[in-house]
Amino acid sequence: MIINFLLNCGSCAATVRAIQIRDVDLGGGVVFYRHTKNRKTQVIPLCSPMIAILREYGRYRGGEPTDYLFCTETGTQLTENGLRQSIARYNTRCGVQKTSIHLFCHTFARKYLIDCGGDAFTLQKLLGHSALATTKHYCAIYDADLTKNYDNFSPLAQMKASGAKIKMAARGR
């Protein structure tokens, strides 16, 4: 459940641990982060599969609006160490060598920007960064990324595909 959430939102551990049931609006398809590093509430969209997963989880979990969304078996807030250990156990069972909650943020950012074609400014807002330079650190670009789907973004390829005539832009005089 938490793995899906991390891959949907790219949240940091402290933010995920602080989410209460009332912070999730499945009808609106968003989650409100009320406890962030910059102390500003963020509104983060949820994709359709995540909404379905959270609906099922809510039916199974129950709870009061002020209860933590992700909690221990006794209903208390997860500790950072408890969350880290749970993720490490899950990743080990799945054969994942590198395990860190923060790597989910990097994975989310890279997938959003490189693999899914999202834009850097929206990603910046989703991650809650005030500077685009901070977001840049989350998105390593490899040589293979430069050629992947390049025809979809090349002005020449787009013009040729649409049958448009290629004209030189006139200089302003």
Language-model region placement:
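Active-site/catalytic core of tyrosine-dependent DNA strand-transfer enzymes
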Residues: 48-96
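Catalytic tyrosine of NAD(P)H-dependent dehydrogenase/reductases that use a Tyr as the general acid/base
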Residues: 101-102, 138
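C-terminal secondary-structure termini that scaffold catalytic or DNA-interacting sites
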Residues: 153-173
